[in-house]
Amino acid sequence: MKSRKSLLISLAILATCTAIAVAGFRNQTQKDVGGDAAYQNSWPLTSYAVPKLTDPDKRARREARGKKYIKSTFRVHPDDPAENTTKVDALDPTLPSLPVMQSNTVVLGEVLAANAYLSNDQSGVYSEFNIRIEDVLKNADLEPLTNGCLIDVEREGGRVKFSSGHIHWYSVDKENMPLVGRRYIFFLTRGDQEEAFHILTAYELRGNKVFPLDELPQFKSQAGKNETDFVNALRTLLNTPS
């Protein structure tokens, strides 16, 4: 009986330790990821009733960027009583953990500012981030990029505040938003020079560790890696002939 009791105690301790270890790994790889109210509240916010820009150049620039998300399946509307809308099956599940071939541009940069904008027809919403580049790892875009320069990057989703005071959160399943003041390796695409760079995916660099921004299973393979080792491995991959 004594040995059975000892065995049960040992198994209980083992189960507790395993649960702690799994929870620790989950926190390491998914910290700051969607599903947390505080994190949702950090997403860029725009007003549904935002006035039109009066400067013709700024208005033309914003309309050129906003046309990408017209006729959005988000169907942003003030009469929608829901708290959130999530678009599913929009992220390519076959995307490699390091999508260097799929990216025009790969940079290390710090997020300086974030804003949300409605599409031209107000059916969609997207978030735009101003990035200060620390290091250009790849650039096949027509725009020359140098360390220290500023660029705008964007991705679909954001929060919209209606005149009633109601705030609706619009997201793409398994995609998250970078946070102001944080440093990331960004994998970017762009098809039109009038557009901001589009975030394919990104990895946050924090405390000399790597944290995937998005939630596809293959991205977790990079979670917790040493920052220097991660960047060096990425450079090697980028310099390897395809």
Feature locations, PLM:
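Transition segments tied to proteolytic processing and entry into folded domains
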Residues: K2-S242
